[in-house]
């Protein structure tokens, strides 16, 4: 039995959830999201809770059960609180700035990297070396953070580059004479 899958998803006040076949739709103060569940999983709304259950007992059913419940829980959390990822930029002359619908990154290349901010995502730069990505869709927020980090990932010798806030970078020792 899945420890995560058997837990019901609480639907707080101000949030409405509806089922349309295999699609779960959630509306809240921050917006609306939906997810389509796989055929192996069934969902039902009981009062102010949404329960996810399996349609069988195979290994695939069990694997999809916990994941589906977490996807639904992320929808509810997204429309109530939202999600946020912070990136830190380390390096001499490395900086970021938001210009209209673009994020302008100076990462030591001969040119600035210009990243178009997708719909549903907000990016702010409280400091030139800090980027805060927020939105209601957890997958999209993580994907945008990963794409920005990929432009210049942290290198192991000096630690220069773009990294997640709180991420540990394994440091290497340089050559010895």
Curated annotation (Swiss-Prot):
Keyword RNA-binding: yes
This protein's GO CC annotations: cytosolic large ribosomal subunit
GO MF term list: rRNA binding; structural constituent of ribosome
Keywords: Ribonucleoprotein, Ribosomal protein, RNA-binding, rRNA-binding
GO BP: any one term: cytoplasmic translation
InterPro entries: Ribosomal_uL6-like, Ribosomal_uL6-like_a/b-dom_sf, Ribosomal_uL6_a/b-dom, Ribosomal_uL6_bac-type, Ribosomal_uL6_CS
Superkingdom in the source lineage: Bacteria
Lipid biosynthesis listed as a keyword: no
One matching Pfam family: Ribosomal_L6
Protein family membership: Belongs to the universal ribosomal protein uL6 family.
Protein role: This protein binds to the 23S rRNA, and is important in its secondary structure. It is located near the subunit interface in the base of the L7/L12 stalk, and near the tRNA binding site of the peptidyltransferase center.
Subunit relationships: Part of the 50S ribosomal subunit.
Protein name, entry field: Large ribosomal subunit protein uL6
Lineage: Bacteria, Pseudomonadati, Pseudomonadota, Alphaproteobacteria, Hyphomicrobiales
Gene from which this protein is expressed: rplF
